[in-house]
């Protein structure tokens, strides 16, 4: 693994010649590192952070984004999304993320033009190439730059660099759009994502930092890290009671534990496990 200084130098070099940049900034560790590197390369006055606001994101994510931009001294603009107006999103096909990301990036590109930014960049890293990410196609069509990816920096190195730069998000749990909790082919509604978000906040409040609540109709399928499964079993009565209040008739615990992108598991992989696939989504 490269030394942190060398990795950061490669990343800054990817940004050096841009003159100015607008950063698609979720408030997560990847885009936080991207934003900090842009400030190093270009100066805070030549960088603007754009954060999407949508029912598919937890409100806490915007709070984190505001905190990081304040600490870095960067101008911050909130961009409202309109994915629930797009049947290509709400019908929840396998390329759902393409439709969502296309609309969002169009909004951000227009905002970048208003700010006179030379480039729109995001926090996609080298490890993102290995997952099902239709949103990358939307980014490519709009000339969005991926400096972390171009510098060959993956998730583990992102966290290491973020820690060395003392970014408050260096150990933040992985986040993903709440729509990714709904199996492909099942309609996405504001009510469903609100129920998922509220359920995950219940788990966060009980100390489960990395978790997902998958929405299977009236069934909530909970994923926590493998090391936390025993603790989740111990808290099962409280968890079940509080999630039933949110509209879930049945509350289950996935014994495979948390895994990002579990809704993308191929049917043959699920069949090999002896389970029957119930659908898919990203995250």
Briefly describe each language-model feature range.
Residues 172-192:
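Internal, active-site/partner-interface "lid" segment
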Residues 215-217, 221-233:
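A short interface-forming secondary-structure element
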